[in-house]
Amino acid sequence: MPKMKTHRGAAKRFKVLKSGKVKRSRAYKSHLLTHKNAKRKRRLRKATYLVGADAKNIKRLLPYS
């Protein structure tokens, strides 16, 4: 059986932790930031986690993580 391929787009965006949780960064933090307030930008710096079916789908794309 051939090796499974890692989905490179998913590999760049998600990280599977030891606990099995899938970590991701938040959107809306790359440009057009001047009108966003400091509190909002500070919240966007923090990572968040996928749950349920979303996490399962991403894990399927990352077979070696």
UniProtKB/Swiss-Prot annotation:
InterPro entries associated with the record: Ribosomal_bL35, Ribosomal_bL35-like, Ribosomal_bL35_CS, Ribosomal_bL35_sf
Single GO molecular function: structural constituent of ribosome
UniProt key word Ribosomal protein: yes
Transmembrane regions listed in the UniProt entry: none
Pfam (any one): Ribosomal_L35p
Keywords: Ribonucleoprotein, Ribosomal protein
GO biological process: translation
Domain of life according to the entry: Bacteria
An annotated GO cellular component: cytosolic large ribosomal subunit
PANTHER family hit by this protein: 54S RIBOSOMAL PROTEIN BL35M, LARGE RIBOSOMAL SUBUNIT PROTEIN BL35M
Family affiliation: Belongs to the bacterial ribosomal protein bL35 family.
Name under which the protein is recorded: Large ribosomal subunit protein bL35
Name of the gene this protein is made from: rpmI
